[in-house]
UniProtKB/Swiss-Prot annotation:
HAMAP family: RibP_PPkinase_B. ATP binds at residues 58-60. This is Ribose-phosphate pyrophosphokinase. Its main location: cytoplasm. It is an enzyme of class 2 (transferase). It is found in: Cytoplasm. It comes from Synechocystis sp. (strain ATCC 27184 / PCC 6803 / Kazusa). The active site is at 214.
Length: 333
């Protein structure tokens, strides 16, 4: 049985057809990941709503919703990935346009939440940008947020509106199970990711857990110090929420191999892939790098070990459940 329970397709499509006629449930896509939005729309059996998007000569963005959404339940899909500032501003303008068009309910769907790592002060006179982004989204007029794999769970509490939290792990776990790997050990790349790795291991038939003790010297620079757990002769699965420069994972893979790991897989929901991630990931340290399509991966960032899985059905199911006032959290139990 799939990780996502699904309402019968024909029933759903017939219901959505009637709903769409009344402009009740409407789906719109920003420009950051249109292919994901189209997949979500196909799952729901509906079309992406028409929207005019253009830039003025000075770089300012113009958005116009090109159909009536008065009284509608509107969902705006826009991961705030690179270029994060442009994509965030586009989302805010989309929300504002829908609010001024008298949408009954506006849900910001954020497959990737930009600025999530700035979730607390680690030094004096710093901004907590993750909270600022939450304030901006709320202030623009969103009444609900649907986010996937937030860097830290407490970001949900930064919102004064409902925030539904999804996880990309079900599609990754289903894929790993299909490979029938043996002698698995799930590895957290740092102490902060232990809860995520433990939940991941539980879904993989209670696989054993190992932890890499890491101390970060500066932003995007990590030093691996020690391994807690046994990986000798085993297939190690490194689990994280995102891959940025891949420094943590590549150093982790070296440590795991030095400790006797037979194979090393890297799994993450968000493929940020900042330089020099591609060189690190494609250099032979990993049997496979498994990510999802919350962030679009350009063709020139593909490499032989890369596998990209779709989370569109998860997002589509969550949207449907919110619209029907059903449980979202039960999808991930």
């Amino acid at each position: 049985m799939s990780a996502v329970s699904r309402i019968a397709t024909l029933t759903r499509q017939s219901m959505l057809s009637a709903l769409s006629d009344n402009n009740r449930l409407r789906l719109f896509s920003g420009s950051s990941n249109p292919s994901l939005s189209q997949e979500v729309a196909r799952y729901l059996g509906m079309d992406i709503g028409p929207m005019l998007r253009k830039r003025f000569a000075d770089g300012e963005l113009y958005i116009q919703i090109q159909e009536s959404i008065r009284g509608g339940d509107v969902y705006l899909i826009q991961p705030c990935c690179h270029p994060v500032n442009d994509n965030l501003m586009e989302l805010l303008i989309m929300i504002d346009a829908c609010r001024r068009a008298s949408a009954r309910q506006i849900t910001a769907v954020l497959p990737y939440y930009g600025y999530a790592r700035a979730d607390r002060k680690t030094a004096g006179r710093e901004s907590i940008s993750a909270k600022l982004v939450a304030n901006l989204i709320t202030g623009a007029g969103a009444q609900r947020v649907l986010a996937m794999d937030l860097h830290s769970a407490q970001i949900q509490g930064y919102f004064d509106i409902p925030c539904d939290h999804m996880y990309g792990s079900p599609v990754i776990i289903d894929y790993l199970k299909s490979k029938q790997l043996t002698d698995l050990v799930v590895v957290s790349p740092d102490v902060g990711g232990v809860a995520r790795a433990r939940a991941f291991a539980k879904k993989l038939n209670d696989a054993p857990l190992a932890i890499i003790d890491k101390r970060r010297q500066s932003h995007n620079v990590a030093e691996v110090l020690n391994l807690i757990g046994d990986v000798d002769g085993k297939t190690a699965v490194l689990v994280d929420d995102m891959i940025d420069t891949a420094g943590t994972l590549s150093e982790g893979s070296r440590l795991l191999r030095a400790q006797g790991a037979r194979q090393v897989y890297a799994c993450a929901t968000h493929a940020v892939f900042s330089e020099p991630a591609i060189n690190r990931l494609s250099g032979g340290l990993f049997e496979e790098v498994i990510v999802t399509n919350t962030i679009p991966v350009p063709d020139d960032h593909h490499f032989p070990q890369l596998t990209i899985l779709s989370v569109a059905n998860l997002i589509g199911e969550a949207i449907w459940r919110i619209h029907e006032e059903s449980s979202v959290s039960s999808m991930f139990r």
